[in-house]
Regions:
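N-terminal amphipathic/basic-hydrophobic helices that include classical n-h-c signal peptides
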Residues: 1-18
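Hydrophobic/aromatic residues within transmembrane alpha-helices
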Residues: 42, 79, 92, 143-145
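An acidic, glycine-rich surface segment that forms the CoA-thioester-binding/catalytic face
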Residues: 20, 66-69, 93-133
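Conserved CoA-thioester-binding segment of acyl-CoA-metabolizing enzymes
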Residues: 14, 18-84
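Short gly/ser/thr-rich secondary-structure transition/capping motifs
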Residues: 23-26, 59-60, 108-114, 168
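Short, active-site-adjacent cap segments at secondary-structure transitions
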Residues: 84-88, 137
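CoA-thioester-processing core
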Residues: 115-125, 131, 137-175
């Protein structure tokens, strides 16, 4: 039913032809979303790509966080990733020139209207627990910084490599 679908537009124009319906109860490529007894379990599932964030995943996360926020049965969210090598290696730069990346581009937009990866960016007021097992780089910090509780395994590493690739970490909420 419509209650299971979250409508979102990567371009923020909110017109019908620009809308993408994402059914949060159906499998999504790159992220798993499961609900158990009031717990929203969110798992980044792109281990072959270092659990990096593909441009199309921004709409998925927006739909997931909207469901967490608006579903009265959800009391807490837990976000983690598959494997123990990478929690999240940030934005998948190999997809930076894709059509999905062009749709998600945030040029000429206020940050608040451009980036929707994390709970804070989606106005989630419920508690969020972030479980980090492995390396967290760049955009992966969105989830860590916005969590109420962070549980890091002994092999967790937190890296901001923006300077190494000639970028400024202007998007991540580090600080």
């Amino acid at each position: 039913g419509r209650e299971n679908k979250i409508y979102c537009s990567l371009r923020q124009d909110w017109e019908c032809d620009g809308m993408t319906a994402i059914d949060v109860n159906q499998p999504m490529d790159g992220v798993r979303y499961e609900k158990h007894n009031g717990i929203a379990a969110i798992t980044i599932d792109r281990s072959a790509r270092g659990n990096s964030l593909a441009p199309v995943m921004q709409a998925m996360f927006r739909a997931i966080w909207s469901d967490v926020r608006d579903n009265p049965d959800m009391r807490v969210a837990v976000i983690t990733a598959v494997g123990d090598r990478h929690f999240c290696t940030g934005f998948d730069v190999s997809e930076a020139d894709s059509e999905a990346a062009a749709d998600a581009v945030f040029v000429d937009k206020p940050l608040r209207e451009a980036v929707f990866w994390s709970p804070y960016q989606n106005d989630v007021w419920k508690p969020v627990i972030c479980v980090v097992n492995g390396t967290c780089v760049g955009g992966g910090h969105h989830f860590v910084v916005d969590a109420d509780i962070v549980i890091a395994s002994r092999n967790a590493k937190f890296i901001d490599s923006h300077v190494n690739v000639g970028m400024v970490g202007a998007i991540e909420n580090i600080g």
